[in-house]
Amino acid sequence: ATLGGFKEEEYTRDCLKAVDDARAYGINTIVDATTNECGRNVRFLKKISDMTGMNIICSTGYYFQAESAYAYWNFRRGFANIEEEIYEMMVTELTKGIEGTDIKAGVIKLASSFNEITPTEEIFFKAAARAQKETGCVIITHTQLGTMGPEQAQLLTANGADPSKIAIGHM
């Protein structure tokens, strides 16, 4: 991943403090829902986990279209089965590891646009439902300003996702 400007020493100090603060409340697991293209850094998360003993669960998935890598996926949609590619990526990151490591995602993160689920976002939701059916993992979502939560749930469950393993965010 390209993470220009990543200040590892400073961020390590900040994260160690955040973990200490969380641990003071009895928290022993943190979910980092940063998506693949939004700066997810699994090696850094593992470093913090190893230093502190905190369980840190990272995600696989993509953010909403306006702030994501969707230009690439929209281009690929013209000549490839991107639902299959996205599904395979998610299952690989959940079962084998991320970016050539043995660090596995523990959740799928999805997002939709304000007042709509775009056609490409819909493909991600369908791929995620398939990946959840295969792996049993939780799907967490992001809604823009609280819109589209029920529609996200309907789309996921219509494609076979287990509603007891779906968390809709920001409603």
Model features per residue range: what roles?
Residues 47-50, 55-57, 61-138:
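Active-site gating/metal-coordination segments in enzymes
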Residues 44-45, 71, 118-124, 146-160:
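Distinct, well-ordered alpha-helical segments
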Residues 134-171:
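Active-site core of metal-dependent hydrolases
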Residues 2-34, 38-55, 83-103:
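Alpha-helical scaffold segments that flank or form the walls of functional sites
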Residues 2-11, 110-116, 139-144:
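Glycine-rich phosphate-binding "P-loop"
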Residues 35-41, 117, 147, 170-171:
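Acidic-and-aromatic substrate-binding clefts and catalytic sites of carbohydrate-active enzymes
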